[in-house]
């Protein structure tokens, strides 16, 4: 849908939001690198406690590398989720690359984990829950 001002409206899954907030509250750092331009999405993510948000990204690997340098991380310490061709370089660069069930075939082929959930339908929750369960940090 498009708003009266011509802005593309997006929905966000409440369960995804809970999982992101829960992860942040438990010491995980979440960053967003998106080609999108929706400031309402940015506001929602800020409200969840995400402050590393890069919109209008045309070359995501640049922001990926900036985040790694900023926080003194190695590629192996990063988990990335993506669903389309522009995400492939960062999926391949990360220690773990994930995608939703409805990602394009090229992304699925590059990913280490394909969620059974579609994007916007609890995929982020699925991935965060899997990681936190493995680390004995889930509820």
Locations of the language-model features?
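Conserved functional loop/turn residues at catalytic and ligand-binding sites
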Residues: 27, 36, 49, 72, ...
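Gly/Ser/Thr-rich beta-alpha loop segments that engage phosphate groups in nucleotides
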Residues: 8, 33, 37, 84, ...
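Substrate-recognition element of Asp-dependent hydrolases with the DxDx(T/V) motif
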Residues: 20-44, 55, 91
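Mg2+-dependent phosphoryl-transfer enzymes with acidic/Ser/Thr/Gly-rich catalytic loops
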Residues: 2-4, 13, 54, 61-139
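PIN-domain endoribonuclease scaffold, especially VapC-family toxins
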Residues: 42-51, 56-62
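Active-site neighborhood of HAD-like aspartate-dependent phosphohydrolases
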Residues: 1-29
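Conserved short-loop catalytic and cofactor-binding motifs
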Residues: 7-8, 29, 33, 48-52, ...
């Amino acid at each position: 849908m498009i708003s009266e001002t011509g802005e593309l409206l997006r929905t966000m899954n409440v369960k995804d939001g809970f999982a992101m907030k829960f992860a942040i509250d438990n010491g995980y750092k979440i960053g967003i690198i998106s080609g999108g331009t929706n400031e309402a999405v940015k506001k929602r993510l800020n409200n969840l406690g995400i402050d590393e948000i890069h919109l209008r990204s045309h070359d995501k690997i640049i922001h990926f590398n900036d985040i790694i340098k900023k926080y003194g991380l190695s590629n192996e310490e990063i988990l990335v989720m993506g669903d389309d061709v522009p995400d492939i370089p960062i999926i391949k660069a990360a220690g773990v690359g994930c995608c939703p069930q409805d990602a394009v075939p090229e992304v699925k082929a590059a990913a280490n984990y394909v969620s059974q959930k579609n994007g916007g339908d609890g995929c982020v929750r699925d991935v965060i829950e899997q990681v936190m369960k493995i680390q004995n940090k889930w509820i």
